[in-house]
């Protein structure tokens, strides 16, 4: 999807426009995201992660090039991040990997410049990140990657047990007035509790029980994440990134626990990691003598008229964004 940079940055002050086209690729465990920066325009693409990470990355790259009207040879630099970053290789384009924590921090900072504290909930882990609001650099972070509790995978299992689609789980939870008790310490215990609670609800043919279980699941996951935040400290300027940031139930319960509101982004922060990777790609390109020599020999010329006009939805494959991590 094509965006004007000024339309997706909260402050309207876009200072990340690179001199040459750069790309950030965030290859997640379930979904993969790409961002292409060129002048004052931002292109995004979102697809499910396939079996082979390189093929997924190449698919994203092709979609971004098709939408922007650019050629592969025009790209100055690519930065890869996310679960599959170490599997990627490019022989014809300068490429580096940057950790997903650094990229989520930089992406949140670029989209929401007041950000100081980030919650990132993905399919396999959750993170609490404190950043320097002046630079977007990570100051401190903690993560939960040892247990599925507090992750998108936990929510996915809950939705399956309740017999609903994952994107329905959040809205169903919002219908609850009395969240059911669900363990926040272990996903195995939580699953057992959900089965028992569901059985009682089914015996009573009680849709209210389903909503209460869904709300309890969200509260359980949110408490796990809240504990992570307590270890890094919570400062004003909260940002919520990752696929689970699209879940309205999780958004609400976290705000309740935190007694604070998340900043509302103009760009879906499922793209935080890939946006941050693209920003880092711009920095690497600017510092590279090899890249400078390439464009000195063949100056980059791009006409916005080359960008296809009717492709706004063509580059995003429809699938459940709430676990596109």
Q: Each predicted region: which residue ranges?
A:
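Adenine-nucleotide phosphate-binding core of ATP-dependent small-molecule kinases
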Residues: 192-228, 270
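Acidic, glycine/GT-rich loop-and beta-edge segments that sit at the periphery of enzyme/chaperone cores
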Residues: 2-6, 283-325
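Conserved phosphate-binding/catalytic loops in two-lobed NTP-binding clefts
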Residues: 95-101, 255-275
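Glycine-rich phosphate-binding/hydrolytic loop that grips phosphoryl groups
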Residues: 106, 155-156, 160, 266-305
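Glycine-rich phosphate-binding loop plus the immediately following alpha-helix
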Residues: 49-53, 133, 137-175, 273, ...
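Short glycine-rich, Thr/Ser-proximal phosphate-binding strand/loop in the N-terminal lobe
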Residues: 19-63, 138-145
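Glycine-rich phosphate-binding loops at beta-strand->alpha-helix junctions
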Residues: 82-84, 234-257, 268-273
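Gly/Thr-rich phosphate-binding beta-strand-loop-beta motif of the actin/hexokinase/Hsp70
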Residues: 8-42, 115-135, 325
């Amino acid at each position: 999807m094509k965006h004007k940079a000024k339309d997706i940055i909260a402050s309207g002050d876009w200072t990340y426009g690179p001199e040459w086209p750069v790309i950030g690729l965030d290859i997640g465990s379930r979904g993969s995201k790409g961002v292409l920066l060129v002048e004052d325009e931002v292109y995004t693409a979102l697809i499910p992660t396939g079996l082979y990470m390189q093929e997924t990355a190449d698919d994203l790259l092709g979609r971004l090039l098709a939408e922007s009207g650019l050629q592969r040879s025009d790209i100055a630099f690519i930065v890869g991040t996310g679960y599959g970053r170490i599997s990627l290789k490019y022989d014809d384009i300068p490429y580096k990997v940057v950790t997903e924590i650094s990229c989520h921090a930089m992406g949140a900072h670029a989209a929401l410049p007041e950000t100081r504290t980030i919650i990132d909930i993905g399919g396999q882990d959750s993170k609490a990140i404190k950043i320097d609001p002046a630079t977007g650099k990570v100051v401190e972070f903690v993560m939960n990657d040892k247990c599925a509790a507090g992750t998108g995978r936990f929510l996915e299992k809950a939705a399956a047990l309740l017999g609903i689609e994952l994107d329905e789980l959040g809205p169903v939870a919002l219908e609850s007035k009395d969240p059911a008790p669900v363990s926040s310490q272990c996903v195995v215990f939580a699953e057992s509790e959900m089965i028992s609670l569901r059985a009682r609800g089914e015996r009573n043919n009680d849709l209210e029980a389903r909503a209460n279980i869904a709300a309890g699941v969200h509260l359980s996951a949110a408490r796990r994440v809240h504990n992570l935040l307590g270890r890094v400290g919570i400062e004003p300027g909260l940002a919520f990134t990752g696929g689970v940031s699209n879940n309205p139930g999780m958004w609400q319960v976290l705000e309740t626990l935190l007694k604070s509101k998340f900043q509302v982004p103009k760009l879906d922060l499922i793209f935080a990691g890939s946006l941050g990777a693209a920003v880092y790609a711009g920095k690497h390109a600017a510092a590279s003598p090899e890249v400078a020599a390439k464009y000195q020999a063949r100056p980059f010329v791009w006409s916005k008229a080359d960008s296809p006009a009717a492709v706004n939805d063509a580059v995003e494959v429809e699938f459940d964004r709430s676990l596109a991590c």
